Amino acid sequence: MMRTHEAGSLRAGHAGQSVTLAGWVARRRDHGGVIFIDLRDASGVAQVVFREGEMAERAHRLRSEFCLRITGEVVRRPEGNENPEIGTGDIEVTATELEVLSESAPLPFPLDEHLEVGEETRLRHRYLDLRRNGPAKAMRMRSEVNRIARDVLHGRDFVEVETPTMTRSTPEGARDFLIPARLQPGNWYALPQSPQLFKQLLMVGGLERYFQIARCYRDEDFRADRQPEFTQLDIEMSFVDQDDVIELGEEIISALWRETAGHEIPRPIQRMTYADAMARFGTDKPDLRFGLELTEMTEYFADTPFRVFRAPYVGAVVMPGGADQPRRQLDAWQDWAKQRGAKGLAYVLVGQDGTLSGPVAKNLSDGERDGLVKAVGAAPGDCVFFAAGDRSSSRALLGAARLEIGERCGLIDHDAWSFVWVVDAPMFESIDDTDDVAVGSGRWTAVHHPFTSPNADWVDNFESDPANALAWAYDIVCNGNEIGGGSIRIHRSDVQKRVFELLGISEEQAQDKFGFLLEAFKYGPPPHGGIAFGWDRICMLLAGADSLRDVIAFPKSGGGYDPLTGAPSPITVEQRKEAGVDAKPAAKVGDESISVFPPGVVEKQG
């Protein structure tokens, strides 16, 4: 046996026992010829003492991160030398045997938790970073999150199924990571962007309740909150409606927060329509930890003399106490808005006597000035920010301003948890209103994906008014972060055909890209729906981390680069030839590239 006890498990009750420990030297101190080391293993730290004589002599050569095996007697620390900060603070181990299992080179950075170390350096030596308490704790918490979810789902008779990670390239919005098929030169596998189509096939196969902690891959341009490979808790259920999926989602989320954060989520979690979220908060991911809301002012300024406010949409958001901001701070708000692609952020200052000032106020009519404070819910001393233009971008700007105001004014309780379901999402959006890759060649693209079912009010007539058609789609939001989302799927072939026609996807194109799914749907598919939770983001929130990278064992940095292994890296000419990278298959007639899943948060594919 390499060791008899874990270092962090020792307590006063072990006093008098002989123990053998194994771990790393976290700290070494020399006090008048007596050597003290903090021996660290996965369980914690124990203080080991090498008294004068041979043991102290042998301990002199020990350095940080030497890997040791030590035998000694557990004794209580002298009175006054206890350390209440650690679980083993009442005892120490007097060493009688020492074995150096391996030595350590000088460290590239100190492993002290209290010292700041650059992220690139930490990721390059991630194996050392994981010896620190914070990263190690995040990994253990993530393992616990997996266990909790599995317990909930197994308790409901769900079946954990592993779907392929080498599959056919199917259009799902982002680019695929491709793998050459060596035995079939010119042909390629793709790594899955999600298990979406396979989990629907499992429902056709009669499994009824499926889940998977799934690895997914998207070859996207770098974004700060994304990783090219990520994890989602993927779920699909047969014979369910939207309420059934939401109820299961709430049980999972409640169990996670209760068992890892000690927080009991009030249930049922409130619901808000997509339209309401956009109108009140300027986003479909509203942070409800504070109550500041947008006010639409389009009708109020319908006859305004101010040319800037003669726009399809005018909205406002109030900054409490913002009238006291100096001019340079108000100018900084303009720079803030321009960084988000806007021309600026109009504002009106409300004086303590109720008078309005600022560059916008003088351009308003007397009637507009007189009623403005009441219309937006402002008070003396407040600043009112405005955005005018198209509805989508103006709301987005005000929504971002709302969050910035919340931070600057201390309105957000960072110890609070606030959850909301956003439901009744639009089924389609015009290709003119999105930067996403168009779905098919029609005027409309799917907001979620083209297998999302229209809701009961729209299933028979969505073609008549695509702009207002609503889907059985739902996202769950925590503190302004989308942590999961899904939909009820189309299981009727006639409805699926009509959706494809509206999106401009021909029958030939549909068969070429995902004919295997359409073929399966000929054989009595059940009504089904599901959800996918963004596992990395959930773990980040539960760990109180600032970045997804903090809760991933070996994350990528900017642009998908791995500082640890140097991936991606070139391959040799021989590897390239053997893999058939340059082989060209015979072109198929009518083989057109269609994007079916718009780029976006992976949970939307759930």
From Swiss-Prot:
An annotated GO BP: aspartyl-tRNA aminoacylation
Q: Where in the cell is it found?
A: Cytoplasm
Q: Please list the residues that bind ATP.
A: 218-220, 227, 482, 534-537
* GO molecular function, a single term: ATP binding
On whether ATP-binding is a keyword of this UniProt record, the answer is: yes
Positions with a binding annotation for L-aspartate: 172, 218, 448, 489
Could you tell me the keywords of this UniProt record? Aminoacyl-tRNA synthetase, ATP-binding, Cytoplasm, Ligase, Nucleotide-binding, Protein biosynthesis
Q: What is its EC number?
A: 6.1.1.23
Keyword tRNA processing, does the record have it?
Answer: no
Q: What Gene3D superfamilies has UniProt attached to this entry? A: Bira Bifunctional Protein, Domain 2, GAD-like domain, Nucleic acid-binding proteins
Q: Which reaction does it catalyse?
A: tRNA(Asx) + L-aspartate + ATP = L-aspartyl-tRNA(Asx) + AMP + diphosphate
Cellular component (GO) terms are:
cytoplasm
Q: Which PANTHER family match?
A: ASPARTATE--TRNA LIGASE, MITOCHONDRIAL, ASPARTYL/LYSYL-TRNA SYNTHETASE
Quaternary structure, per UniProt, is: Homodimer.
Q: Which family is this sequence assigned to?
A: Belongs to the class-II aminoacyl-tRNA synthetase family. Type 1 subfamily.
Q: Which HAMAP family match?
A: Asp_tRNA_synth_type1
Q: Write the protein's name.
A: Aspartate--tRNA(Asp/Asn) ligase
Please state the gene responsible for encoding this protein: aspS
